Regions:
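Acidic, low-complexity terminal tails and accessory targeting/binding regions
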Residues: 2-3, 69, 88-99, 161-228
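Residue-level preference for the first positions of well-ordered beta-strands
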Residues: 4, 143-149
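General small-molecule cofactor/ligand-binding pocket signal
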Residues: 5, 80-82, 193
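Loop-to-helix element that buttresses phosphate recognition and phosphoryl-transfer chemistry
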Residues: 8-62, 66-67, 118-133
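Active-site metal-binding loops of divalent metal-dependent hydrolases
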Residues: 10, 145, 152
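Short, basic/glycine-rich phosphate-binding loops at helix/coil junctions
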Residues: 17-20, 105-117
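Phosphate-coordination/substrate-recognition cap region in phosphate-metabolizing enzymes
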Residues: 38-108
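Glycine-rich phosphate-binding loop signature in dinucleotide/nucleotide-binding domains
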Residues: 46-48, 139-144
Length: 228
């Protein structure tokens, strides 16, 4: 059983200005985002992390830095930077204000048929899902708790894939800045334990339960977590 935490970067200056940052350099966190990153470190306090898989973009690294500072150097998890977790290449849309993009004829495609969307001089959202799931499967084949730090649309594509829903339902999924989504992988199937969580301590959900038989979904919904 592998447990994976999907973390979206905290609130950035591009989020604040309503700009589609894409892969632009120098996109840092706002004051609010820095507070979110500190709160995230508190929420993950005491969690034994085996490895962190992270986008190469600065805002993701700034999000996870407060957590790393709380971990003694000798105990810090290995960090793997992977392009598969990078932000969507929005091509010519990069750096533009979202309000101006609403008027673009392709905006309706993004909203209604994201599987068909290919950003001008950029990449297609369907391609994003393929590379994102490649990173997830890499993490799932590792031992111990894995953390993935990435971007909103990338994580939305992962959630859609894990749920087995069509990519055209992608926009029905919400992933907020500094949110945590928790996945379990039993060797053949993924399950979502929590989605877009921005407030509760995560240590209990981060625990990996070792069982001879992998956990299965129960009819009737199951009894929930054991009460202490």
């Amino acid at each position: 059983m592998t447990r994976i935490l999907l973390i979206r970067h905290a609130h950035s200056v591009a989020n604040d200005r309503g700009i589609l940052a894409g892969r632009s350099a120098g996109v840092i966190l706002t004051e609010h985002g820095s507070k979110q990153a500190s709160d995230l470190a508190e929420r993950l306090k005491g969690v034994a992390i085996a490895k962190i898989h992270i986008s190469p973009l600065e805002r993701c690294h700034l999000t996870i830095n407060p957590l790393l500072k709380k971990i003694p150097v000798k105990n810090r998890p290995k960090i793997v930077i992977t392009e598969d977790l990078s932000e969507v290449d929005y091509g010519k849309w990069t750096g533009k204000k979202l309000v101006s993009l609403y008027r673009d004829k392709l905006w309706k495609v993004v909203q209604d048929r994201p599987s068909a969307m290919y950003f001008p001089d950029g990449e297609g959202l369907a391609n994003v899902q393929v590379r994102a799931m490649r990173a997830v499967h890499t993490a799932a084949n590792e031992s111990g708790l894995q953390i993935i730090v990435s971007h909103g649309d990338v994580i939305k594509s992962i959630v859609a894939a894990v749920l087995g829903t069509h990519m055209d339902n992608f926009q029905k999924i919400v992933i907020d800045p500094a949110s945590i989504t928790v996945l379990d992988f039993d060797g053949s199937n993924f399950r979502i334990l929590t989605l877009n969580n921005t407030s509760t301590p995560i240590a209990e959900l981060a625990k990996i339960v070792s069982k001879k038989r992998p956990a299965r979904a129960l009819l009737g919904g199951g009894a929930g977590r054991k009460r202490k």
